């Protein structure tokens, strides 16, 4: 494989990591994004080309060179020296213990056991992916991203690593990148309903643009008021004689022009208001279903689901 492409990929991967965790100013981040685009165009690679990844990251390679350490063999060849049978068995035992700690929500202990398993067998993508899940439960999304990256480097066809990467990136409000990883997860596991759902949510987040006049949840009040269908129906509602009588009675302090014998004014007011609201909602649903769906989307609290990703391997 072309080592120039490997080097370009390593640099792009490093720059992406700096964007996420480097604590850079907005100007510096913009400069890095431009640099990434230039490198991707010049060498024909992207951060998704995980088959170009080396076992060590660029900072690890640089550190080894700066300290005079011998270049690890696995940087010259993807082949790794497999762990002994004893180490493999102990690593599996530690992983299982980590899984048990996840079940009882002892996430810090789970991180510890997965880390010990990684020390014995650093070529196992599952161990990194499981630790990423534990990091996410602790709110350490940056750590989860790094472990998912390592898992993907080890096994580029590991769908769960892409799915968990998407979750971590979503939690960091990196929805553009989250969408890319969810799509890759679905490409590898097309029947996974959780990936499908999370992809839709991430794409929705991308489409949601805050409005300068928005209220709670960045709802676009200006857009609603500029919607001719909405304004026409609202005008018809307010010109309804029954509604005008109702509002007049409520404003006058409880005088109930719609009242009937034996029924309190408040009951009539409430019933009339509910009826009018139902009629208005039905008209909106029939004439502008897209607007109704927008309203529902704003009201719902929608966050990515980790349902099947909670299951450790």
Curated annotation (Swiss-Prot):
PROSITE patterns associated with the record: TPR, TPR_REGION
Claim: Cytoplasm is one of the keywords in the record: yes
GO molecular-function terms, A-Z: BAT3 complex binding; identical protein binding; molecular adaptor activity
Main location: cytoplasm
Locations listed in the record: Cytoplasm; Nucleus
TPR repeat ranges per the UniProt record: 91-124, 125-158, 159-192
Effect listed in the UniProt record for changing residue 38 to A: Reduces tail-anchored proteins transfer
Entry note about domains: The second tetratricopeptide repeat (TPR 2) mediates the interaction with SARS-CoV accessory protein 7a.
Complex and partners: Homodimer. Homooligomer. Interacts with DNAJC5 and DNAJC5B. Interacts (via TPR repeats) with HSP90AA1. Interacts (via Gln-rich region) with SLC2A1. Interacts with HSP90AB1. Interacts (via TPR repeats) with HSPA8/Hsc70; the interaction is direct. Interacts with BAG6 (via ubiquitin-like domain); interaction prevents interaction between BAG6 and RNF126. Forms a multiprotein complex, at least composed of DNAJB12, DNAJB14, HSPA8/Hsc70 and SGTA; interaction with DNAJB14 and HSPA8/Hsc70 is direct.
Record-given protein name: Small glutamine-rich tetratricopeptide repeat-containing protein alpha
Lineage: Eukaryota, Metazoa, Chordata, Craniata, Vertebrata
């Amino acid at each position: 494989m072309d080592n120039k492409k490997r080097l370009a990929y390593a640099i792009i991967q490093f720059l992406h990591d700096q964007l996420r965790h480097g604590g850079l100013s907005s100007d510096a981040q913009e400069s890095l994004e431009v640099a990434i685009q230039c490198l991707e165009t010049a060498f024909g690679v992207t951060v998704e080309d995980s088959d170009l990844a080396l076992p060590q990251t660029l900072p690890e390679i640089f550190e080894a060179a700066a300290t005079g350490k011998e270049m690890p063999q696995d940087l010259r060849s993807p082949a790794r020296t497999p762990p002994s049978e004893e180490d493999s068995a102990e690593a599996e035992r530690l992983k299982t213990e980590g899984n048990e700690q996840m079940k009882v929500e002892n996430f810090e202990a789970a991180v510890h056991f997965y880390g010990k398993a990684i020390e014995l067998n650093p070529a196992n993508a599952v161990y990194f992916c499981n630790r990423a899940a534990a990091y996410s439960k602790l709110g350490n999304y940056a750590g989860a991203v790094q472990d998912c990256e390592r898992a993907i480097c080890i096994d580029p066809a590991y769908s769960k690593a892409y799915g968990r990467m998407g979750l971590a990136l979503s939690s960091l409000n990196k929805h553009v990148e989250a969408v890319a990883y969810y799509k890759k997860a679905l490409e590898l596991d097309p029947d996974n309903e959780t990936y499908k759902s999370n992809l839709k949510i991430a794409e929705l987040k991308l489409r949601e643009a805050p409005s300068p006049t928005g209220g709670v949840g960045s709802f676009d009040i200006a857009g609603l008021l500029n919607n001719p269908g909405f304004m026409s129906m609202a005008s018809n509602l307010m010109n309804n004689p029954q509604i005008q009588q109702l509002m007049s009675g409520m404003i006058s302090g409880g005088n109930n022009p719609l009242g009937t014998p034996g029924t309190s004014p408040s009951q009539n007011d409430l019933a009339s208001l509910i009826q009018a609201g139902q009629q208005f909602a039905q008209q909106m649903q029939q004439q502008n279903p897209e607007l109704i769906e927008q309203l529902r989307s704003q009201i719902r609290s929608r966050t990515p689901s980790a349902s099947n990703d909670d299951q450790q391997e």
